[in-house]
Swiss-Prot record:
UniProt cross-references to PROSITE patterns, sorted A to Z: HOMEOBOX_1 (PS00027), HOMEOBOX_2 (PS50071)
Keywords: Developmental protein, DNA-binding, Homeobox, Nucleus, Transcription, Transcription regulation
DNA-binding region, residues: 202-261
Gene that this sequence comes from: HOXD12
Protein name: Homeobox protein Hox-D12
GO biological process, one term: embryonic digit morphogenesis
Cell location: Nucleus
Recorded GO CC terms: chromatin; nucleus; transcription regulator complex
Length: 270
């Protein structure tokens, strides 16, 4: 049908140096631009070009303006429908619908028919998302979590025994007793101490002054606002107070007097 014969002028003529009236190449030019003086000119007839001598039954259908420049076929866009003028951000159709290929430069129909592997749809990610939501909000049902959440528990850095410890219901009001989780958390507080208390030294309970002690200290303050060490020692022994308590009381009493004086001065100005 479309087999090319070796006896055609395009093949035999180039070997036997047969002149053809329809040759259009420069006959005396070498490929590198030089000229051979000793050899006779060799011409390549138009029939030697395989794309120009293809029978009409094997040639693809081309538009009228596609053949130009002495029989050379120009690449053209072949599409079954009109050209799609969609913007780059349009996502109404698949990407393959907006592509057009030239028949000479494109790949075979088998390669063009292959579709690019697409990403996994969002529906396949729904079980994993549901598992994460169940593990995030369902604290009482950790044992009933989906397999996706079980894999998350298995991937914890300190989870050799964490999987077995979380089979039962989790109570947030109690301290964690799991041995596998204890290594990942802070050291637990001693039993009986509240969560807000520090494990260090307990704060000393405040001992309020009695009315008799306050009266004695007020009388001494009226005599002298600043007390020396000897007088402070006498007051602490007589009132059954420590030296630090007497010192702090005098400091607070001086600050209270200063605030009262400043308030009176402010009221006098206005």
């Amino acid at each position: 049908m479309c087999e090319r014969s070796l006896y055609r002028a395009g093949y035999v003529g180039s070997l036997l140096n047969l002149q053809s009236p329809d040759s259009f190449y420069f006959s005396n030019l070498r490929p590198n631009g030089g000229q051979l003086a000793a050899l006779p000119p060799i011409s390549y007839p138009r029939g030697a070009l395989p794309w120009a001598a293809t029978p009409a039954s094997c040639a693809p259908a081309q538009p009228a303006g596609a053949t130009a420049f002495g029989g050379f076929s120009q690449p053209y866009l072949a599409g079954s429908g009109p050209l799609g003028l969609q913007p780059p951000t349009a996502k109404d159709g698949p990407e393959e619908q907006a592509k057009f290929y030239a028949p000479e430069a494109a790949a075979g129909p088998e390669e063009r028919g292959r579709t690019r592997p697409s990403f996994a749809p969002e529906s396949s990610l729904a079980p994993a998302v549901a598992a994460l939501k169940a593990a995030k909000y369902d604290y009482a049902g950790v044992g009933r979590a989906t397999p996706g959440s079980t894999t998350l528990l298995q991937g914890a850095p300190c989870a050799p025994g964490f999987k077995d410890d979380t089979k039962g219901p989790l109570n947030l009001n109690m301290t964690v007793q799991a041995a596998g989780v204890a290594s990942c958390l802070r050291p637990s507080l001693p039993d009986g101490l509240p969560w807000g208390a520090a494990p260090g030294r307990a704060r000393k309970k405040r001992k309020p002054y009695t009315k008799q002690q306050i009266a004695e200290l007020e009388n001494e303050f009226l005599v002298n606002e600043f007390i020396n060490r000897q007088k402070r020692k006498e007051l602490s022994n007589r009132l059954n107070l420590s030296d630090q308590q007497v010192k702090i009381w005098f400091q607070n009493r001086r600050m209270k007097k200063k605030r009262v004086v400043l308030r009176e001065q402010a009221l006098a100005l206005y």
